[in-house]
Amino acid sequence: MRIVLAYSGGLDTSVILKLMQEKLGAEVITVTVDVGQKDDFEKIEEKAYKFGAVKHYYIDAKEEFAENYVCKAIKANALYENAYPLSTALARPLIVEKLVEVAKKEGAGIIAHGCTGKGNDQVRFNLGIKALMPEAEILQPVAEWNLTRDWEMEYAKKHGIPVSDKIYSIDENIWGRSIEGGVLEDPSIEPPEEVFEWTVSIEKAPDKPEYVTIGFENGVPVSLNGEKMKLLELILKLNEIAGKHGVGRIDHIEDRSVGIKSREVYEAPAAVTLIKAHQDLEKLTLTKWVIEFKSIVDSKWSWLVYNGLWYEPLRLALEGFIDEAEKAVNGEVTVKLWKGNAIVVGRKSDNALYDVKMATYEKFSTFDQKLAKGFIELFGMQSVLAYNMLHGVHSTSNISEIKEAIKTLE
Amino acid sequence: MRIVLAYSGGLDTSVILKLMQEKLGAEVITVTVDVGQKDDFEKIEEKAYKFGAVKHYYIDAKEEFAENYVCKAIKANALYENAYPLSTALARPLIVEKLVEVAKKEGAGIIAHGCTGKGNDQVRFNLGIKALMPEAEILQPVAEWNLTRDWEMEYAKKHGIPVSDKIYSIDENIWGRSIEGGVLEDPSIEPPEEVFEWTVSIEKAPDKPEYVTIGFENGVPVSLNGEKMKLLELILKLNEIAGKHGVGRIDHIEDRSVGIKSREVYEAPAAVTLIKAHQDLEKLTLTKWVIEFKSIVDSKWSWLVYNGLWYEPLRLALEGFIDEAEKAVNGEVTVKLWKGNAIVVGRKSDNALYDVKMATYEKFSTFDQKLAKGFIELFGMQSVLAYNMLHGVHSTSNISEIKEAIKTLE
Amino acid sequence: MRIVLAYSGGLDTSVILKLMQEKLGAEVITVTVDVGQKDDFEKIEEKAYKFGAVKHYYIDAKEEFAENYVCKAIKANALYENAYPLSTALARPLIVEKLVEVAKKEGAGIIAHGCTGKGNDQVRFNLGIKALMPEAEILQPVAEWNLTRDWEMEYAKKHGIPVSDKIYSIDENIWGRSIEGGVLEDPSIEPPEEVFEWTVSIEKAPDKPEYVTIGFENGVPVSLNGEKMKLLELILKLNEIAGKHGVGRIDHIEDRSVGIKSREVYEAPAAVTLIKAHQDLEKLTLTKWVIEFKSIVDSKWSWLVYNGLWYEPLRLALEGFIDEAEKAVNGEVTVKLWKGNAIVVGRKSDNALYDVKMATYEKFSTFDQKLAKGFIELFGMQSVLAYNMLHGVHSTSNISEIKEAIKTLE
Amino acid sequence: MRIVLAYSGGLDTSVILKLMQEKLGAEVITVTVDVGQKDDFEKIEEKAYKFGAVKHYYIDAKEEFAENYVCKAIKANALYENAYPLSTALARPLIVEKLVEVAKKEGAGIIAHGCTGKGNDQVRFNLGIKALMPEAEILQPVAEWNLTRDWEMEYAKKHGIPVSDKIYSIDENIWGRSIEGGVLEDPSIEPPEEVFEWTVSIEKAPDKPEYVTIGFENGVPVSLNGEKMKLLELILKLNEIAGKHGVGRIDHIEDRSVGIKSREVYEAPAAVTLIKAHQDLEKLTLTKWVIEFKSIVDSKWSWLVYNGLWYEPLRLALEGFIDEAEKAVNGEVTVKLWKGNAIVVGRKSDNALYDVKMATYEKFSTFDQKLAKGFIELFGMQSVLAYNMLHGVHSTSNISEIKEAIKTLE
């Protein structure tokens, strides 16, 4: 029996690694996918072999993550419940893809992961595996074997698995960092400063603002301060710059896939900055009809990805919409990073429906007036009529005194 | 011929006041509605009589504005295009109501206002008047008589109407301040510090944060830092406090009713703070189903009000929804005001779907695991199936090796 | 141990009734709620006692069903996936309410029902019970004890429970009849004539049409052919009349709550006729803004009720919208019933936004022309601009040859 | 001065043709685009020259209309306000395209058409011309010169233009026929039989039904009764077959672009049949998530096309969604045409999410039961909690009597 295990090097997956050998007599192949978490991957590999892995894979998927996953999220202004940039949610399908690749290559019929039965990640892992490799068995030991933290701690000690005493549960990738547990579970209490690593406090942020200019092509960031660069590089740089100014902290009440509400805290300096800039550029370059409809498309996209429905055909259809719409989203946006704020202070674009409009605006100024009259009349006709009827008021004056008066003026 | 004129005391309406007497021989009754603009109303009255008004009305509608208009906007999280709290838009129907009251009382058949033919306010004024008093004639001299700024200036000089040299066009009420014109028309340029009056710059904001706690009942703010107060008072206080911390500046590209895109700059310290707090409390107290649907209801409400469709029956229907939903929105939210940021750092409520959930969460922890399994399976069934079919992969294994193995473990 | 059982008198619930006594030693109280199914309720009572019920309740809830459930469905134009009038789905929460009433009165801590684990009704029963009586245990023997049809048949024979040989599984109430099973499970095969009881085939329908006129007040049917009557009576009559003309057969692919697609066949003569009439009257009396938004509200309402979320706060909020909107839905609609067709051929209303419009239409005819010009210009401005920009075409002609020419004509 | 005129050969456009020569001294080039209207095109050409056209174009665009316009409408299930298949609305942008082609080829700077200022077509013509040829002047003589019917009649008589005495105003193309005017303007009166030409009355329809089977590929009809054919041919045949059975009459209240409600009557046998079949096949082949969202996309598409916003970027974005979604819409649908009814009685597809489901359904039958339990619990968790809290009921029983009892049974 061969099992592929998504291995982070932490307590849960180390215990599982050991346990699956012990209880199932399985050969376990460990896989660590690098999506930008700040880990020591050599140490993780060491651990994997130490705890009995027959083979270990380290897969650097950072660039793939930026190009094929984060890129789509930016175009979709992806903020689940208007707040969470989906960092963890976005990385899960990529990790699943890698696990399945290894499982197929290694002839393993079982894929295991360390998710509990209470969170969102089990939904993302399990549905991803079912989609990509329906013939695989999914093994979710924490849930299926009802492993409790206490039991795990004891088991770990027995088997020489190092047990950290950290209070918070962290997940990280280039698109953001999520912090759970401890005092954060009480939504009435302000998150203590110690939970943050990527962002400084407003107090410690520089007194002077810093301006960054982001260039977009087809809705995708392609340059920073005039310098062309790959999305991965741009995100890494922006995480640093914006984080230094305290930008990107998020604290809100979130509805998990499984129906539970929970208080969630994130840091996502690049994500917050880029999505603000992107949304602003859309307002300049997209028609009001596209903006209005795209906001529905965008939230549905976020909802699907958050809830593990990455492989649902609806995602591709939504992207069919988004890719077409984004063709006009070209230009540059300047963001001022200052004391926790990311403020868009300037934007320009060859596709601006604004600049051109300004030109024609002047041209219109002589006859625009009559245009508006007709517009208002027809635009509001039904509403006015309905209100009048409901309140029993009716227009009676066909011949108005003013018309005559105005004529004399003309 | 009697005309009721919405009179601000500024250049446009002073010119119109004079002009309507001169050209139409009209008796003009001026009306100034106080919705919180920081004007000298005695001086305005003086001016009105000086330029020939036969009668002047000053109407203090601040409390009515807070209770019947702003209140609804808070419950609807009203932000047009996710940015503009509708300050001016909200006040227009109230002003119209007052104009109509005066027109009826004074037997005037004509209502005049100073809007141009290019903006949003003409839509709001004209549709409001048509709804409330369809028998009235609407006179919009700037548009109908094609008055240009230059012509107005000259006319003003001739008639002793004072001409200010201010660059920006301002509209103010308790819910916000809008600034237009001058360099702001170029969306690529950062708004100069001089345009702001209600908010200090981040630089000048205090180094220490200030916490405010807002209490809500049925979605409406009812207390500040534990002290019960009327909405009007609460807003006025919060404008001051939040403004002092540089909170509430808005700068975005906006789609006007008439189809033009324009760059708009606002200050709205209380509005920004209260809507953030309100949205956060909704996440704690409303089910995910209500939150998701209400976001559609909310944006439609904002769209209607922005576009002058206050009297459209749809607004009342949307409020039917909102009022029912808001019954659960009770509790307190703590906001940290600091260097331009308004950060929600704590929330509590007897209606929290979170706290109770935490309790039951624990209870569930023993059997939740199987619940999630069934949930994931059925929740993702169609998506997985569709993906498998499309990619020609099919689940084949009915009898799995793992099931047997697991049994031995149990 | 006392159990309240939802008892239909059929095989499943009779087996359960017996089994719960035998296996659990329970005292079982049977409840049959009459929502218009064409059953012999005395016989059902006899059976209940025969198979060991300690007490039997027959509850006539037909009028309550019409007034408090069907009434809301009509106002919401309730058609799940544009097809199914929700007959069964609507009745479930009412039945649950009655079960809970009995359970509380009789001091029973357990409520049992005969649903399988594959359908929609288990969702509706279980969520309803959890909402109304969370302290109650829910017993769903077919699912929990894995009862198969074969096992049930054998058990029934052993215990003298009559076993019918009917192929189809039927559920009926005043709002419709659903037919499942047998050949209907193959969606490529036309439903055989034998499955229908409430509607004649088109062949056997009368050669001559029949006109019915339905009067509505606030969106609710209140009269038939000019005669005022209660909704229950109106529905019963209309089921007969429309059914006689072959109106009301439905055959479509439906997405069940649990994720399965299934082919469903229904008969609902009154429902189909009334909803058509109601929708038509809405088009006459509601503004286009309300119609457009209400269609979203309506489908969400249907979705909630279909999926057993009757007690979800969102339903009440949607009804807040609907009740407000329906205030204008007054008038009469004439429907022609003929050979399977229900065709709206006439409608009138004092609230018509049409008749009044016709009047003003004439008035407008002299100057409407310029109104439309301005409307079109502003309505289409952004779209035209965006298209021009994208295709590199720009308007260049400011002074047109035609303008001069036209002037000479004027 | 050269003018290109959209010429139908009817009274309006013949009068305009003459008038533009007379009043403007213009050279007029007439263009008749054949989109399937049942006209004598040779006679129209004769007339054009007789009334002074310097050149006449007859352009057969039927196939282009089917392939590039109707095709998209089918994929979008296009029914404006759930009723109107957009026949006229769809043809307008194609006609505009042809007019612009001719104008450019012939060096004409003006494009003229015969629309009044009250209807929808002016919006479609004018916005189309502005998009495709912004440098062109648009001449809309009926509106701009305020031509009344009486004046036109007199003018026609004077200039030998034949005046018909038909009561109804007709517009026709392969996708449908619209009938306006006369008694139809009273929405309370049933349309008289004489207005229909493409469909027989139910009375005269055959006593026996006729089955047609329509094959779809990527959402587009490609075969009729097993025979592959081009969409144009398929539509023409189906218009005949379905029309013969009285299928395709539409009568509803419609909201025009300009805000007026009007009663509209259409015949569209192929459109009604194909859209029904297409929608049914979608239910079989698309996931519930896609179906739900696509219904929003579809109505927005119809809304845009109805309102003349064919060139709005949003249309292309919506089609990006639709084209992706429709990849799964392959298969065959059988429709029974009978006495005015078009009833889908069978459907099959290799992409069916139903047939496969049936297979797996069986597989699930042993453990599905527990899956549903978990699903229901989590699916309804928040709703139940919210209801309980609101009504002050709380679950208290942690240890239930039944659990013990059930255990003894297992």
UniProtKB/Swiss-Prot annotation, chains A, B, C, D:
Top-level EC class as recorded in UniProt = ligase
Its pathway is:
Amino-acid biosynthesis; L-arginine biosynthesis; L-arginine from L-ornithine and carbamoyl phosphate: step 2/3
Query: So where does L-aspartate get bound?
Result: 116, 120-121
**CDD domains per record:** ASS
Give Gene Ontology CC terms: cytoplasm
Q: Where in the cell is it found?
A: Cytoplasm
Task: Give this protein's Gene Ontology molecular function annotations.
Answer: argininosuccinate synthase activity; ATP binding
In terms of SUPFAM superfamilies, this protein maps to: Adenine nucleotide alpha hydrolases-like, Argininosuccinate synthetase, C-terminal domain
- Keywords, comma-separated and alphabetical: Amino-acid biosynthesis, Arginine biosynthesis, ATP-binding, Cytoplasm, Ligase, Nucleotide-binding
Reactions that this protein is recorded to catalyse? L-citrulline + L-aspartate + ATP = 2-(N(omega)-L-arginino)succinate + AMP + diphosphate + H(+)
Where along the chain is ATP bound? 6-14, 114
One Gene Ontology term of the biological-process aspect is: argininosuccinate metabolic process
Enzyme nomenclature, EC number? 6.3.4.5
Which Pfam families does its entry note?
Arginosuc_syn_C (PF20979), Arginosuc_synth (PF00764)
Q: State if 4Fe-4S is listed as a keyword.
A: no
Summarize where L-citrulline binds, as residue positions. 84, 120, 124, 169, 178, 254, 266
Q: How does it assemble?
A: Homotetramer.
| PANTHER family for this protein | ARGININOSUCCINATE SYNTHASE
Q: Which family does it belong to?
A: Belongs to the argininosuccinate synthase family. Type 1 subfamily.
What is the protein name given in its UniProt record? Argininosuccinate synthase
- Organism whose genome encodes this protein: Pyrococcus furiosus (strain ATCC 43587 / DSM 3638 / JCM 8422 / Vc1)
